[in-house]
Swiss-Prot record:
Family stated for the protein in its record: Belongs to the class-II aminoacyl-tRNA synthetase family.
GO annotation terms (biological process): arginyl-tRNA aminoacylation; glycyl-tRNA aminoacylation
Organism: Salmonella paratyphi C (strain RKS4594)
Gene: glyS
NCBIfam families cross-referenced by the UniProt entry: glyS (TIGR00211)
Catalysed reactions, as listed in the record: tRNA(Gly) + glycine + ATP = glycyl-tRNA(Gly) + AMP + diphosphate
GO molecular function: arginine-tRNA ligase activity; ATP binding; glycine-tRNA ligase activity
InterPro entries in the cross-refs: DALR_anticod-bd (IPR008909), Gly-tRNA-synth_bsu (IPR015944), Gly-tRNA-synth_heterodimer (IPR006194)
Primary localisation category: cytoplasm
Complex formation: Tetramer of two alpha and two beta subunits.
Protein name in the entry: Glycine--tRNA ligase beta subunit
Keyword NADP: no
Assigned keywords, A-Z: Aminoacyl-tRNA synthetase, ATP-binding, Cytoplasm, Ligase, Nucleotide-binding, Protein biosynthesis
Entry's localization field: Cytoplasm
């Protein structure tokens, strides 16, 4: 069967830059699935994406499906014919469905009976006939939240479409996709190269587009060029470019022919906190800031043009003129804001609603202030500093700088607090109260910041759950999942002695009578334990290990983490599977027991050597392990408990638990309950698979 290279390119208006990669990757995944479902043999599927195009190139695509033999079994002979040998209605209906008459059917004999059988040789459809619908289906499945319609057409897509190129080798596959007739025409760069040209063979892509159209269609190559050129440009001025992955991706999605240039701004703007300058450079202008080797911002920035200019100084000058007013605004806001102390903004917080039922930002500030102080007392942080940080925590939201540059919240609070002469740990806490903002983000660096960050998040969790507005599906407008995971990460990774039970109760208490959900404390804790499940799964822990610990519902996160590590280690022990099975057996036996058990195991009632030996081991271990459990040394405890494998095996091999004599039976059940209680001090080992 012959094979050829296949190309599809959809030429569009400028595609959303933040969605470009996902659109291309989804297009490739969807089309690959279509090929596989159709049984079309193919090689590597490459995707290409630039601001005005999405393309796929498939190597070694078969020109048709393979022929195949089809067998359709019909009714059993007994049901296919009546007593006179005439075909039944069921047989005739089946035959019509196969396109034959009953007498043309074969018969299939097996040891279970005889049936009518239809065999046919089905010729595979041509790729040319199959591909148009496959492309259309793949495009229809793209993750596009909002579709556009253009002109008088009823066609909908993410952006208006101008060209559709469909080539199998050197042949155009005729089709109408997204309202456009397929052709071999490709559009180049808007201002460089050939605006439009034809491609003779799919193998020429993307090289022909690079050479004639001045477009780098390979997304990764374009991104790599920007990164390399920006690093070199920064090196030439003695600095290091801030090439964050998200901005690199966005810039690579904005240009077809990247040209990296270096510009500068006035040094006087460096008196403004670097975060505000960086915010406007990266967020508004898509520029890359440059730092010196000590991490200090330089009065330069790197940007990416989409054209090779004969006079790049004009482009540089233009960008410098664009950014200057934004930096001047930041300078003005910074100087204006510093004329007031942070706490002078407290009254204005009363004018901003946090949530309709939960009050204003001033109300939230009062709760955070109290809760941060309470948490500080629990973890050994400075209570006065934590309380002060809580009071000032939202004041920077009322400043000119944060109003204009919203992403500078927190960090500007830190700078203004330093200007006001606040304690350093208070100032740092104002910046770090929102950490961690995302997976892998840094945690608050000092105890006061930890107290404030936990207080802020717990206040939100208690309040929103308290009015019954917990997250549903993908909707989480108050970012409660992120808040819960943030609290857990801080407590676990900083090893803080906090209990979710008392922490949540205190957060709820501070709301007074505003909350309507009577089960708010349990709901918040259950939600946070659910976040634990997701966290540990991402860390690579097995589901049954997580369930074994969750079954005990430990509410101290640091303690939960210690149990997880202990059970995970226990699973590696030779005795683990046997003891897990034994615990499961004990659990089932105790679940079926209906008689009240004794408080203790009575040694005088023990008869068999195996039960006497098991009881002896339990007494020794119970006394030995109490300090382990008290100190949270769960891994050591489980290693000690692993020694029970032999006496437990002996017990089940030689002892009849449900003895006829009531006192012996109850004593043995009590012995098993004491065994189970020891393991349950750590986790429910019976849940391990």
């Amino acid at each position: 069967m012959s094979e050829k290279t296949f190309l599809v390119e959809i030429g569009t208006e400028e595609l959303p830059p933040k969605a470009l990669r996902s659109l291309a990757e989804s297009f490739a995944a969807n089309f690959t699935a279509e090929l596989d479902n159709a049984g079309l043999a193919h090689g590597n599927v490459e995707w290409f994406a630039a601001p005005r195009r999405l393309a796929l190139k498939v190597a070694n695509l078969a020109e048709s499906q393979p022929d195949r033999e089809v067998e359709k079994r019909g009714p059993a002979i007994a049901q296919a014919f009546d007593a006179e040998g005439k075909p039944s209605k069921a047989a005739e209906g089946w035959a019509r469905g196969c396109g034959i008459t009953v007498d043309q059917a074969e018969r299939l004999k097996t040891d279970k009976g005889e049936w009518l059988l239809y065999r046919a040789h089905v010729k595979g459809e041509s790729t040319e006939a199959l591909v148009p619908n496959m492309v259309a289906t793949s495009l229809a499945k793209l993750p596009i939240p909002k579709l556009m319609r253009w002109g008088a057409s009823d066609v909908h897509f993410v952006r208006p479409v101008h060209t559709v190129t469909l080539l199998l080798g050197d042949k155009v596959i005729p089709a109408t996709i997204l309202g456009i007739q397929s052709d071999r025409v490709i559009r180049g760069h808007r201002f460089m190269g050939e605006p439009e040209f034809t491609i003779d063979n799919a193998d020429q892509y993307p090289q022909i587009l690079l050479e004639r159209g001045k477009v780098i269609a390979d997304y990764e190559a374009r991104k790599a060029k920007i990164k390399a050129d920006a690093e070199e440009a920064a090196r030439k001025i003695g600095g290091n470019a801030d090439l964050s992955e998200s901005l690199l991706e966005e810039v690579a999605s904005l240009v077809e022919w990247p040209v990296v240039l270096t510009a500068k701004f006035e040094e006087k703007f460096l008196a403004v906190p670097a975060e505000a300058l960086v915010y406007t450079m990266k967020g508004d202008q898509k520029y890359f800031p440059v730092y010196d080797n000590a991490g200090k911002l330089l009065p330069n920035f790197i940007f990416v043009a989409n054209i090779e200019s004969k006079d790049p100084t004009q482009i540089i000058s233009g960008n410098e003129k664009v950014v200057r007013p934004r930096l001047a605004d930041a300078e003005f806001f910074f100087n204006t804001d510093r004329k007031k102390r942070l706490e002078d903004h407290l009254p204005r917080l009363q004018t901003v609603l946090f949530q309709q039922q939960l009050g204003t930002l001033r109300d939230k500030t009062d709760r955070i202030q109290a809760l941060a102080g309470w948490i500080a007392g629990q973890i050994g942080a400075d209570v006065n500093h934590a309380t002060r940080a809580g009071l000032l925590s939202k004041c920077d939201l009322m400043t000119n700088m944060v109003f204009e540059f919203t992403d500078t919240q927190g960090v500007m609070g830190m700078h203004y607090a330093r200007h006001d002469g606040e304690a350093e740990d208070v100032a740092v806490a104002l910046n770090e109260q929102y950490q961690p903002r995302f997976a892998g983000d840094d945690l608050p660096s000092n105890p006061v910041a930890c107290a404030l960050a936990i207080a802020d998040k717990m206040d939100t969790l208690a309040g929103i759950f308290g009015i019954g507005q917990h997250p549903k599906g993908d909707k989480d407008p108050f970012a409660l999942r992120r808040a819960a995971l943030g609290v857990l990460r801080i407590i676990v990774e900083k090893n803080l002695a906090l209990d979710l039970q008392t922490l949540t109760e205190e957060a709820v208490r501070l709301y007074g009578d505003k909350l309507t959900n009577a089960n708010v404390v349990d709901d918040v804790i259950d939600f946070m334990l659910g976040r634990f499940r997701a966290w540990y799964q991402d860390e690579g822990y097995t589901v049954d290990t997580i369930q074994a610990v969750l079954a005990r519902r430990p509410t101290r996160p640091a303690d939960f983490d210690a149990r997880m590590k202990a059970v995970s280690h226990f699973r590696t022990l030779e005795e683990a599977s046997a003891l897990a099975a034994a615990n499961k057996r004990v659990s089932n036996i105790l679940a079926k027991a209906t008689e009240p058990l004794n408080d203790i195991v009575h040694a005088s009632v023990l008869k068999e050597a195996a039960e006497i030996e098991l009881a002896r081991h339990l007494v020794v271990l119970r006394d030995k392990l109490q300090p382990y459990f008290a100190d949270g040394r769960y891994q050591e405890a489980l290693i000690e408990l692993a020694a029970l494998r032999a006496p437990v095996d002996e017990f089940f091999e030689n002892v009849m638990v449900n003895a006829k004599e009531k006192d012996i039976r109850i004593n043995r059940l009590t012995l098993l309950s004491k065994l189970r209680e020891l393991f349950l001090q750590v986790a429910d080992i019976s849940l391990l698979q």
